[in-house]
Amino acid sequence: MAKVPDKPTIEGLESKWNEIWEKEGIYRFDRSKNREEIFSIDTPPPTVSGSLHVGHVFSYTHTDTIARYQRMTGAEVFYPMGWDDNGLPTERRVQNYFGVRCDPTLPYQPDFETPEDAGDEKAIKKRGEINVSRRNFVDLCHILTVEDEQAFEDLWRQLGLSVDWSMTYATIDERCQRIAQKAFLRNLERGEAYQTEAPSLWDVTFRTAVAQAELEDREQSSAYHQLKFHSSSDHGEIIIDTTRPELLPACVALVTHPDDDRYQHLLGTAAITPIFGVEVPILGHELADPEKGTGIAMVCTFGDTTDVTWWRELELPVRAVIDRSGRIVADAPEAITSQTGLEAFALMAGKTIFSAKKEIVQLLQDAEEMVGEPRPINHAVKFFEKGDRPLEIVTSRQWYIKNGGRDAELNQALIARGDEMRWHPPYMQGRYSNWIEGLNGDWLISRQRFFGVPIPLWYKVDERGEIVWDERIVPEETELPIDPSSHVPSGFDETQRNQPGGFVGEVDIMDTWATSSLTPQIACGWGEDEDLFARTYPMDMRPQGHDIIRTWLFSTAVRSHLEEAAAPWRNCALSGWILDPDRKKMSKSKGNVVTPKGLLDQYGSDAVRYWAANGRPGTDTAFDEGQMKIGRRLAIKILNASKFSLTLAGDSEADLASVSNPLDQALLSKLADLIETATAAFDDFDYARALERTEQFFWGFTDDYVELVKARAYGSQGPQEAESAHTTLVITLDALLRLFAPFLPFVTAEVWEWSHQDSIHCAPWPTKVNLTKGLPEEIDIKLLDAASETLSEVRRAKTEAKRSLKVKAEKVVVSASSERINLVNLVYNDLVEAGNIEALELVEQEGITPQVEVTLADEE
């Protein structure tokens, strides 16, 4: 007997059911299952840098619908949760929250106390930043990330993620550090990781190197400047166009296309730089664009990546003039020897790029070495995706992992790995392949920051006190994790640190992607729990945003290819962005995000999940509270329709043999088709289509079918007809609740409890075969349309006449083809009762669109 409450409500369901799910271990992973029984998910670890926004809710809901569906189909779902709590976003959050700045030169203060005004922006601004040691800074990072992670978990629970909360990790925890360091050392041993001193992209704000995958183009205002170089072979002036006149002292050559007739006579000669008087060669290179500027360009070390290519391929010297803070260095390059050149450089030294540019332009104009005025332009400039100043290129010693950027064979092998994965939607594979094909260098993984996984190496120092970079001291895997800045290598003691004949520790940390690229290994227990690893890896699903295919997805594929010679997952499910009202991506950096807590409280978690699940795979979706209102209305309707159906059906069992009425049989046949469609959609990771079709059926069920059979269900046509309606209501409601369960876990759990002892989230997914095996083979589901459309016309007539739907229809005449009339005749009694029709006349008339004429009773 169903226990239906008098006044069901959706309020408070989240706390009630989260407590029950946790207590009963509904989502606890059973690791005794075999690999073929397990569906493992490589859950994205959200960045711990403050708060989650609706974009997170959007994409994580998509993952959860798949997890819940798989669980109901009988799979044992491995669904862990991680926290990405190292890297620049976390550092910035800690820096702002506590009002501190890390100074690695300061000693550790064991008695350092957390600032009392933490989180108070006004107080921090008034007192200014406090400089702290690296270790003290890392301690503060740990304090804040623990608080943030708990807040994240609370919100995920409120949203209803069916995660096994006993299986969590943080990318900075000891286990993750050990796995990341071990993987790096194995890359190093196999020659897949290497260190080199070379030009690298550099963010002057964060003072760290940046990888190609972390770049973005931004439109910036600039200007072209025409400078006069002077031929050293009596060929007169050579005019070049540049947007970077401040790099003139770094000029090492001029280049032109070898086939450009205008400058062929200059190839092999030299030119003198204006102001600085340095002789530079004039060379040919196919990358020089005859259509750009004057067709001849200066090569500087370094203005952009093309300069790097020219420098490398033409074997040019380095004349670096920009330091790591984005200012002009103090000492002029050795090539500048003239008094005029040295005096000019002294005026630029120490200045920012902007100020140095103004200075050199003035000098050029005063010396009449510039043609005309600067010509303003807008052009794309490379930025670090988290930075706010244009990137520079500086020469530095960095660590790299091979990723196919300089190895054609590896490049093709990684593209082929994409063929081993199913992509949802399929066209996203093109983004993966295109990214790999466009790589121009290996993966730079070292960062000059503070809170991250240390690169686990030391270097020997020779007797002269020089670091011998090639003589690395490598720890044993059993010693990991280690921090070279505080740990001492075997065979040495602390007194030998930074001393001749001793050692130095590697000061760089790994890029956060270097750890996140190992999430399958971390989640599955690589090298730590081989039994778990064998049961869960390769994983079944990688859900993520389409914008980080080039970073997270690709880097994970690289690490898995190098370590396991396999693709890390079988399926890649891509979510789109959330767009603001101006159709721009929501992001913290743009300041246009909406935090989800208030939405979850206001509309309920099921309503917010409904909005999220309507976003199709890979498609950008607008933030729309209107959709949440619809979702809330749907959840309430499920409660009320379930109460009505279960109350009406009483103790009826789901016995298909009791379904004898043609309308009931047609509904169940249509339900069977829905189940087949929803199942196919979920199997293809198209949760949105499964929801759309289920919702369409549900509203037809409640608005039309229930109204049509209501009187019959109350017994107006006898016990057999009533039982047919009761059984159909029970079977349909049972299936619909299970179809809705992945999307609306709270309201479906609540209703299921009224008539079941088990959890709906462990109940079997409905199948078409179980529903149709007890039904007649030939059922015309057009009967449903004939019945509902006829009833709708009767209702419309009453509504247009501004009469109550309960008012009697004196006469209703249905004119249609014989086929249609035969269908309407099958539901004659239900139509008469549902429409309160005194006389229903059916007229056969071939070749016309069905017509319904309604005559209402006179008003009393």
Residue ranges and their predicted role:
Residues Q226, R431, L439-A514, L518, ...:
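Feature 926 captures the class I aminoacyl-tRNA synthetase adenylation module centered on the KMSKS loop
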Residues V100-L106, R134-D139, A349, M421-R422, ...:
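Short, polar/flexible loop-turn hinges at active-site or ligand-entry regions and domain interfaces
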Residues R35-T43, T65, D120-G128, E153-G160, ...:
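Active-site-adjacent bridging/hinge elements
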Residues G99-R135, I336-M348, W469-R497:
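Charged, glycine/proline-rich intrinsically disordered loops and linkers
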Residues F206, F276, G387-R389, V461-R464, ...:
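Short Cys/His-rich metal-coordination motifs, predominantly Zn2+-binding knuckles/fingers
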Residues M1-D259, C300-E334, A367-N411, E437-N440, ...:
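N-terminal, positively charged nucleic-acid-binding surface of large information/translation enzymes
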Residues S59, R92-V100, V210-Q212, H257-P258, ...:
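Short secondary-structure boundary/capping segments
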Residues G55-A67, W83-D84, C176-I179, E237-L363, ...:
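Structured ligand/cofactor/substrate-binding pocket environments in proteins
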